[in-house]
């Protein structure tokens, strides 16, 4: 049975969904995630995403990015591990329970090729520039076979659907999520 609903993401929701920490827990207990984020011009997006993941309880966070982001990461979020872009290999994705892709990634041919390849076979959280790339490749939405969470703000969501009034937003979001079998977190003043 398909579940479809719109619910604000607020403190009450978060408190219900965040696991209690175990006395004998370790970084492997709380999730092993990869962030494919950041570029020379948008370092902050990668750094904020890494810090948010660590501070909300992720166990092991690895950031795949360029040298400038990695250098800043060691100061801004020393709990996160890193991998420089030029050393990336698909084996680095093995064992990851979640992947975030797109926050400040940048829009260029290399990013587009990589996003298209990664989205074709990996469960991911899709944000920022990866959403822009995905909007250019709707066939990926129609043919994906893994769990996807899309996190657009209203402007990014307009790249996928037409809506004229905010009152249409919830209906459009529900229809989109149902059609493409994705979880949609529509960011805004009242995140759904």
Protein language model regions, located:
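Small-residue (G/A/S/T)-rich helix-start motifs and N-terminal tracts that mark the onset
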Residues: 1-123, 132-149, 154, 158-192
């Amino acid at each position: 049975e398909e579940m479809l609903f719109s619910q604000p993401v607020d403190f009450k929701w978060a408190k219900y969904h965040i696991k209690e920490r175990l006395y004998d827990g370790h970084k492997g207990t709380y999730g092993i995630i990869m962030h494919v984020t950041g570029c020379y011009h948008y370092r902050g997006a990668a750094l904020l995403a890494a810090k948010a993941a660590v501070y909300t309880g992720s166990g092991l966070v690895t950031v795949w990015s360029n040298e400038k982001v990695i250098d800043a990461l060691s100061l801004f979020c020393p709990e996160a591990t890193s991998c420089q872009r030029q050393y990336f290999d698909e084996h680095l994705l093995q064992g990851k329970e979640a992947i975030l892709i797109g926050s400040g990634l940048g829009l260029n041919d290399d990013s587009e090729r990589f996003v298209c390849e990664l989205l074709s076979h990996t469960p991911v959280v899709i944000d920022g520039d990866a959403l822009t790339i995905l909007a250019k490749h709707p066939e990926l939405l129609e043919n994906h076979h893994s769990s996807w969470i899309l996190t657009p703000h209203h402007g990014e969501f307009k790249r996928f659907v037409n809506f004229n009034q905010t009152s249409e937003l919830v209906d459009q979001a529900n229809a989109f999520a149902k059609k493409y079998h994705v979880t949609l977190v529509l960011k805004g003043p009242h995140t759904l």
